[in-house]
A protein has these predicted regions:
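Rhodanese-like catalytic fold shared by cysteine-dependent sulfurtransferases
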Residues: 1-79, 98-101, 107-147, 155-201
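A conserved helix-loop-strand patch within extracytoplasmic ligand-binding domains
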Residues: 78-83, 87-89
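A short acidic-Thr-Gly-centered motif at the start of a beta-strand
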Residues: 88-98
Length: 201
């Protein structure tokens, strides 16, 4: 199929990070989505003038993003906030019910240093597995507020939101599609700096 990139396979699902000609990508997705387990897989597309990967890697992992094997996003319905809704909330400084709004950046320090949403909480973590302890230390500043967890593409913040809801922080949401979808749909409003990506786009 002349594809390059990474395919991660885990009990919780698949993560495909691929580049190639449009026909090759669509052909591969047709094969994957013919499987009932992946027929409703969310696909995110972006265009590049060149292929940013050197080879194709397929890896089998315990989790797509190492965090907590007991958290299975496929079995849970995490409430999401669309980019347009988040922008509206940020414009107003509160959610639609008038509740105070807090943004939690679930990325690591290196990524946050390049850019983040204005006034977002930086949990100051070096790796994602440190987030639960960071959330516990921040708990008093999150309780009673609408919390929107965000990350680059939507995977880490989905797991973070599930974890936070399990702690009783019931007004926690994830930013649908992460920062990249926010940029794509509403631009960089309320965001300062750049967004780190894991390839040469």
């Amino acid at each position: 199929l002349e594809l390059k990139g990474t395919i991660l396979v885990a009990p919780e699902g698949l993560n495909l990070f691929l580049a190639g000609a449009k026909e090759a990508i669509e052909g591969f997705l047709h094969i994957v989505q013919a499987d009932q387990r992946f027929c409703s897989m969310r696909i995110k597309r972006s265009w590049s003038e060149h292929v940013p990967f050197r080879r194709l890697k397929v890896r089998v992992e315990a989790e797509i993003i190492t965090f907590d094997p007991s958290i299975n996003p496929a079995g849970l319905n995490t409430p999401t906030v669309s980019p347009a809704t988040l922008k509206r909330w940020l414009d107003k400084g509160q959610d639609d019910q008038g509740q105070a709004l807090v943004l939690l950046d679930t990325r690591n320090e290196e990524e946050v240093a390049l850019g983040s949403f204005e006034s977002a909480i930086n949990p100051q973590i070096r790796k994602f597995t440190e987030l639960p302890a960071a959330v516990e230390s921040l708990r008093s500043s999150l309780e009673g507020k609408t919390v929107v967890a965000f990350c680059t593409g939507g995977i880490r913040c989905e797991k973070a939101a599930i974890h936070m809801r399990s702690l009783g922080l019931q007004h926690t949401y994830q930013l649908e599609g992460g920062i990249l979808k926010y940029f794509e749909e509403v631009g960089a409003a309320h965001y300062q700096g750049d967004c780190f990506v894991f390839d040469a786009r």
